[in-house]
Amino acid sequence: MHQFTHINTNGEANMVDVSIKQDTIRTASAEAFVTMNSETLQMIISGNHHKGDVFATARIAGIQAAKRTWELIPLCHPLLLSKIEIQLEVLTATNQVRIESLCKLSGKTGVEMEALTAVSVAALTIYDMCKAVQKDILIENIRLLHKSGGKSGDFNAA
């Protein structure tokens, strides 16, 4: 079984020392789903939302969140991300928006937390912009889809 890397021998939380690791290409993608009623979704799609372009705002929020993950998650390293991509897909059959992120860099540590933070904040932004018209919007199934690079190898969600 793997050990927690952020816990020292005394059981205290510490940032992992990555100084001796070699730079490798690292990528990660994550997804989240935002479920709402059909009227709210149509308001977003049609561009009739009084706060403006919900998807553009969510996309920018996700990008900004990935860049600032190290400020939000206490033991994350500040990273020089080389790529952040946010895709939003409307699933009209289920009244959902699927958000997918892709983060990439050449560095000493992975970008999983950046990918997860990106979709989380993009989803929260959709909620924030739509809460005036619907308060019971559901954010769910936030998960890592893929990661590559580093000594732990690749991961692909089932």
Curated annotation (Swiss-Prot):
CDD domains: MoaC_PE (cd01420). It catalyses: (8S)-3',8-cyclo-7,8-dihydroguanosine 5'-triphosphate = cyclic pyranopterin phosphate + diphosphate. Gene3D superfamilies: Molybdopterin cofactor biosynthesis C (MoaC) domain. Pathway: Cofactor biosynthesis; molybdopterin biosynthesis. GO terms for biological process: Mo-molybdopterin cofactor biosynthetic process. The active site is at 128. Substrate binds at residues 75-77, 113-114. GO terms for molecular function: cyclic pyranopterin monophosphate synthase activity; GTP 3',8'-cyclase activity. Its EC number is 4.6.1.17. Keywords: Lyase, Molybdenum cofactor biosynthesis. InterPro entries: MoaC, MoaC_bact/euk, MoaC_sf, MoCo_biosynth_MoaA/MoaC, Mopterin_CF_biosynth-C_dom. Belongs to the MoaC family. Catalyzes the conversion of (8S)-3',8-cyclo-7,8-dihydroguanosine 5'-triphosphate to cyclic pyranopterin monophosphate (cPMP). Homohexamer; trimer of dimers. This is Cyclic pyranopterin monophosphate synthase. It comes from Haemophilus ducreyi (strain 35000HP / ATCC 700724).
